[in-house]
Amino acid sequence: MGVFTRAQNRRPSDAPVHFQATSPRAKRRMLIIVNPYAATVSDRLRHLVVYALQGRFEVDAVDTEARGHATELCRQAAHEGYDVVVAFGGDGTVNEAANGLRGSATPLCCLPGGSANVFAKMLGIPAELVDATEHLLAMADDWRPRKVDLGVVNGRCFTFSSGLGLDASVVERVDSRPSLKARLGPYFFAWAAVSTFLRRYLVSPARMEVQAGERTLLGVTAVVQNGSPFTYFQDRPIEIAEGATLDSGALAGAVLHRATPVAMPFIGWRALSRHARVLRHRQVSGLMDIREVTVRTADGRPLPLQADGDYLGDVAEARYSILPRALNVVA
C-alpha cells in the first residue's frame, strides 16, 4: 500500500443502491487520484465512488495537493505495481496522470470530474459519473488494457490536444477564473473566446511560424492534436484538425493564418457544425500525418501555450513530437 491511504470499506448513508458490488475471486489493486478542486468533485461524490468500486477492486484513494502532484503519485503507483490508476477530475488531472504513467505497464482510467472531460469521452467513458462508475465496475469482468499514443510539446505529454495563440489565450483566461469555469462550463469558454479575440487578436496579434517537414506556414494560432475531436461543447464534438486518432502513431494540426472579424464567425460556425469542415475555410491550413512540428515566434513576441486545456505559459518556441503506444488505458 506504500504511502497511499486505504479507503475505508463502509457504506455512506446515501450510497445509491443501484451500484451492484459483487466479490470477484481476486481483486485488482486500484489507486484513485482525486482532484478535490475539480468542477464537479465533492467529498460526498468521492466517498460514494470509492465505496462502489471497493466491491470489485482493492481501492486506495488520495487527493492531489498541488499542480504536478498527480504525476508524482502515478509514478509511485507504477513503481508499487498497482493494476490501474483512476484519475477522478478534469482533463488537467488526466494529463498529469498520463505524464506519470507514460512508458509504464500500469493502465490509466478516468472518471469525469471536470468541465469538459475530453479524454474520457474520447475513450468512450460515459459523461455521467454514475454511468462511468458502473462502466468501470463492469470492466472488472472484461479487463482489456490497450495502448494509445501521447503527444509531446517541449517535454510535456498531452493526451488529446495542444495549441498556441488564440486557443491558449482563451485557456489562460478561463483558468484565471476557476469559479466561473466550474459554474458556467462551456458557456464561459465561449464568452472567453469572443472577449479574448476582441481584446488581443483583433488588432496586431503575435505572429508565428509553423514548420512541419518541408512545409512552413505563417499564422496567429496553431493547434496540434493527438486524436479527434479537438474538444467538446457540452456533448457536441468540436472538430478542427483531421486525420489523427489515439493509436495512429501520428499527429494532426491546423494553422489559422489571420483572425479577422469577418472570418472568425464562419470558422466558429464550421467548428460547431456537424457537416462543414474548418479546414475548408481559406484562412485555415491543415497538417496531416505528421511526427514532428516546430512552432516559433515570427515577430519576437512570446506565444501562449496550452496542453489538454491547461495553460503552460508563454514561449518563444514549441517543439512537438509523438510517442506511439506510450500509455496503457482501460475504458
Residues covered by each model-derived region:
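ATP/nucleoside-binding phosphotransfer catalytic cores, i.e., glycine-rich phosphate-binding loops
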Residues: 2-7, 16-19, 212-214, 240-248, ...
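ATP/NTP phosphate-donor binding region
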Residues: 1-85, 95, 134
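Short Gly/Thr/Asp-enriched flexible loops that form oxyanion-binding sites at enzyme active sites
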Residues: 93-106
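Glycine-rich beta-strand-to-loop/alpha-helix junction loops that act as flexible
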Residues: 36, 88-90, 111-114
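Short N-terminal binding/cap micro-motifs at the start of the first secondary-structure element
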Residues: 39-43, 231, 327-329
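Glycine-rich phosphate/pyrophosphate-binding beta-alpha loops
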Residues: 163, 167, 223-242, 311
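Gly/Ser/Thr-rich active-site loops/lids in small-molecule metabolic enzymes
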Residues: 178-188, 229-259
